[in-house]
């Protein structure tokens, strides 16, 4: 029997009215449903699966119910296995989760009929290196951020690209963003907007103590190294705004293109239409 995974945002009361009929609809169309632990609480007699274990069960595709944050978490869990994601917006912004709830079933019909465009999004792979050893490895759909933690002190950074020193500065932080992440934290820090298909990453400083430092766009083939220097004990590594690790002076964060991409089942709206509708881009009033 074909299987589909359902992953949802925790503590979302309206899911009690969404998930049971969704399970019934999928069953009528020949699908067995794998629920993550957040979704299973809305279905009687079902024990949910840890999100990290869903990929090993090889569902045909995954339905994500929530906002952009839910999608980011789900992407890190299922993208390595090449599982396509249909993201249904239950959040506030919904920049990535572009399918409205009222269009969920009609979009699912298109997915089942293999008539739904597949949009591949580049991911970042990130290694945290301490004392010459890889301490942790991560993947990210939006961004890798090194910034100050609780104490309001500037942190020093050395940035290299492909083994060549580029610059150092003191700042609140530095962002390495994918094209998808260019409309997230990097945008708020003054970084450029990249179309999702652009083969590039961007390095965006956060409040640098300088009159000259600007965001830099590099090819996706580049390897980006960030070494934490002064006040390193006040620095923190964050992946997609969700997973974090305190840093020490001398820690190195190495970012490169991940071996896998996120496959999004989408309605194929114009990227610039989404910018206008979600971020009010280009509006004069």
UniProtKB/Swiss-Prot annotation:
Location relative to the cell: Cytoplasm
EC number: 2.7.1.23
InterPro entries reported in the protein's UniProt record: ATP-NAD_kinase_N (IPR017438), ATP-NAD_kinase_PpnK-typ_C (IPR017437), NAD/diacylglycerol_kinase_sf (IPR016064), NADK (IPR002504)
Function, as annotated: Involved in the regulation of the intracellular balance of NAD and NADP, and is a key enzyme in the biosynthesis of NADP. Catalyzes specifically the phosphorylation on 2'-hydroxyl of the adenosine moiety of NAD to yield NADP.
Gene: nadK
Reaction it catalyzes: NAD(+) + ATP = ADP + NADP(+) + H(+)
Organism: Koribacter versatilis (strain Ellin345)
Family: Belongs to the NAD kinase family.
UniProt entry tagged with the keyword Transmembrane: no
Active site, UniProt feature: 68
Biological process according to GO: NAD metabolic process; NADP biosynthetic process
Keywords: ATP-binding, Cytoplasm, Kinase, NAD, NADP, Nucleotide-binding, Transferase
Disulphide-bonded residues: none
Short name of any one Pfam family annotated for the protein: NAD_kinase
A single GO molecular function term of this UniProt record: NAD+ kinase activity
A single cellular component GO annotation: cytoplasm
Residues the entry annotates as binding NAD(+): 68-69, 142-143, 153, 170, 172, 242
Designated name of the protein: NAD kinase
């Amino acid at each position: 029997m074909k299987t589909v995974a359902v992953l949802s945002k925790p503590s979302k009361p309206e899911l009690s009215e969404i998930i049971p009929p969704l399970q019934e609809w999928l069953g009528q169309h020949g699908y067995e449903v794998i629920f993550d632990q957040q979704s299973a609480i809305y279905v009687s007699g079902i024990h949910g699966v840890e999100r990290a274990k869903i990929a090993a069960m090889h569902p045909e595709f995954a339905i994500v119910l929530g906002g952009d944050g839910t999608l980011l978490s789900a992407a890190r869990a299922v993208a390595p296995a090449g599982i396509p994601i249909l993201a249904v917006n239950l959040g506030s912004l919904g920049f990535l989760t572009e399918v409205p709830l009222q269009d969920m079933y009609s979009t699912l019909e298109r997915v089942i009929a293999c008539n739904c465009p597949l949009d591949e999004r580049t991911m970042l792979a990130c290694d945290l290196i301490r004392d010459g050893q890889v301490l942790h490895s991560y993947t990210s759909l939006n961004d890798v951020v090194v910034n100050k933690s609780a104490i309001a002190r500037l942190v020093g950074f050395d940035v290299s690209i492909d083994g060549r020193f580029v610059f150092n500065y003191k700042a609140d932080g530095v962002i390495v963003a994918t094209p998808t992440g260019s409309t997230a934290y990097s945008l708020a820090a003054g970084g450029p907007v990249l179309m999702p298909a652009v083969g590039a990453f961007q390095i965006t400083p956060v409040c640098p103590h300088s009159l000259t430092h600007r965001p830099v766009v590099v090819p996706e083939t580049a390897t980006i190294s960030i070494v934490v220097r002064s006040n390193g004990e006040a620095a923190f590594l964050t992946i997609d705004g969700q997973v974090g690790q305190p840093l020490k002076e001398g820690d190195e964060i190495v970012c490169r293109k991940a071996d896998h991409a996120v496959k999004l089942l989408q309605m194929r709206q114009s990227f610039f239409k989404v910018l206008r509708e979600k971020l009010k881009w280009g509006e004069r009033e």
